[in-house]
C-alpha cells in the first residue's frame, strides 16, 4: 500500500505529539513540515526555532517557514509536493482557500476542545478557568472560518481537580495524536461523514493576556482557584502586597492599578502556584476562631483579600465567598516557596490585606 503523502503545519508544543505519531507510522509519508519563522526569545532575544521545527529537524524532515501562508510562491511550492492530505495543529496562521482546496482529501485540524465550545486561541485555559469538568479534542475538516469546520471525530477526557493548564495540555496533545492516527485511514477511505458543528453551544476562547492572571479577591474562592490552575504556568495567578505589607510604593504596569484609582501600587508582585479552597473553618485555622474574628466576619471571607491566618499550613485569604489557603507562592524576583518557607522570611500578619 502506498503511504499517504502529508504536509504537516504546526508550531506550538501542542503540535509535536501529532507530528511524532505521523512520522513514526509507515502508513504516512511527511512530504514537508510547515512552521512559523524563528522568533526572538529569551533575555538576549536571539531567534529561536519553534518546538515543531526542532522536532522536524531531529526526525530528518524538510522544513518550510513562510512569513505569510498566503504567499503565492509558498503555495506553489506546496502544490508541487502533491499532498494527499494536510494536517494542521496549532500552526498560528489562517490558511487561504488556495491551501484548503489543495489536497484531494482536504485539510484536517486538531483542536483541543469539544467543538463548537471554545473556538479560538486558548481553549485549554478557559475550560479550566470556567470550572469545566470535561473537555477533549476535536478533529475537523477545515473551512474558511475560525474553528468552524465540520467535525470528523472527537474524544473526551475529564478535567481533574489536580489538573492545571500544563498537565491538561500534555494529555490533550497525546489524545489528539492518538485520535489523528486512528481517524485518517477512515477519513481517506470515505468511511466517516463529517458532521456540521451545531450553532448551539458555540463559544470563543480568547487569547490569554498577562492581566488575566491578576487575582480579584472579590471573586469566590472556587473561581480564583480555577483561574489559578488555568493560568499556570503562564501568566500565573498573581496579586500585590498592600502598602502596609510592602512598606514602599513604586509604579507597576497599568493593568495592575486598583479599580477606580490611578494611584500606583507597590511593585512587589506575589505569584501563587498552589492553593486550596476553604469552605468551612477547621480547627487548624485558629485565627479564624477568635471571638473578634466572628464579630468582624459573620461568614468566612467577608473581607476580600484579608489575611485570615498565616502559619506553616498555609496563608488563608478571604475571598468574595469562602477563602483560599495559599500553599506555594513566589515573590517577584524570588524563588518558588512553600507557605512555611515564605513566612520564615516575610512578615505577614493576620488582618493585613492583599490588594483587591
Regions found by a protein language model. Name each.
Residues 1-44:
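N-terminal Rossmann-like dinucleotide-binding module
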Residues 5-7, 31-33, 58, 62-81, ...:
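Internal alpha/beta domain cores that form substrate/cofactor-binding pockets in large enzymes
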Residues 10, 33, 56, 86, ...:
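A residue-level signal for conserved active-site and pocket-lining positions in enzyme catalytic cores
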Residues 25, 102, 231:
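Acidic-histidine catalytic/liganding microenvironments
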Residues 39-59:
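N-terminal beta-loop-helix "entrance" segment that forms/cooperates
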Residues 85-211:
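Donor/substrate-binding cores of folate-linked one-carbon enzymes
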Residues 218-244, 258-284, 288-289, 295-356:
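An anion-binding loop in the catalytic cleft
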Amino acid at each position: 500500500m502506498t503511504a499517504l503523502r502529508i504536509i504537516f503545519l504546526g508550531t506550538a508544543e501542542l503540535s509535536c505529539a501529532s507530528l511524532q505519531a505521523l512520522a513514526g507510522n509507515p502508513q504516512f509519508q511527511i512530504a514537508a513540515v510547515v512552521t512559523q519563522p524563528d522568533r526572538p526569545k529569551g533575555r538576549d532575544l536571539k531567534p529561536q526555532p519553534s518546538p515543531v521545527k526542532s522536532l522536524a529537524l531531529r526526525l530528518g524532515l524538510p522544513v518550510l517557514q513562510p512569513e505569510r501562508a498566503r504567499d503565492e510562491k509558498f503555495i506553489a511550492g506546496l502544490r508541487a509536493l502533491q499532498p494527499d492530505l494536510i494536517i494542521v495543529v496549532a500552526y498560528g496562521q489562517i490558511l487561504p482557500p488556495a491551501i484548503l482546496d489543495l489536497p484531494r482529501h482536504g485539510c484536517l485540524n486538531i483542536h483541543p476542545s469539544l467543538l463548537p465550545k471554545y473556538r479560538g486561541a486558548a481553549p485549554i485555559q478557559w475550560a479550566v478557568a470556567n470550572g469545566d469538568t470535561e473537555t477533549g479534542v476535536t478533529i475537523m475538516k477545515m473551512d474558511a472560518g475560525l474553528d468552524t469546520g465540520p467535525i470528523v471525530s472527537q474524544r473526551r477526557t475529564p478535567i481533574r481537580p489536580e489538573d492545571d493548564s500544563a498537565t491538561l495540555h500534555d494529555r490533550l496533545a497525546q489524545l489528539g495524536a492518538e485520535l489523528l492516527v486512528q481517524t485518517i485511514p477512515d477519513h481517506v477511505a470515505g468511511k466517516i461523514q463529517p458532521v456540521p458543528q451545531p450553532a448551539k453551544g458555540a463559544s470563543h476562547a480568547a487569547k490569554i493576556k498577562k492581566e488575566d492572571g491578576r487575582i480579584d479577591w472579590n471573586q469566590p474562592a472556587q473561581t480564583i482557584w480555577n483561574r489559578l490552575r488555568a493560568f499556570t504556568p503562564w501568566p500565573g495567578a498573581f496579586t500585590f502586597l498592600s502598602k502596609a505589607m510592602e512598606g514602599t510604593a513604586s509604579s507597576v504596569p497599568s493593568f495592575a492599578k486598583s479599580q477606580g484609582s490611578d494611584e500606583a501600587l507597590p511593585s512587589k508582585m506575589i505569584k501563587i502556584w498552589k492553593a486550596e479552597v476553604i469552605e468551612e473553618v477547621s480547627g487548624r485555622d485558629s485565627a479564624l476562631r477568635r471571638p473578634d474574628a466572628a464579630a468582624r466576619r459573620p461568614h468566612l471571607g467577608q473581607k476580600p483579600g484579608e489575611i485570615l491566618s498565616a502559619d506553616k499550613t498555609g496563608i488563608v485569604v478571604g475571598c468574595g465567598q469562602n477563602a483560599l489557603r495559599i500553599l506555594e507562592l513566589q515573590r517577584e524576583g524570588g524563588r518558588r516557596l512553600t507557605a512555611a518557607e515564605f513566612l520564615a522570611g516575610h512578615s505577614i500578619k493576620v488582618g493585613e490585606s492583599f490588594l483587591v
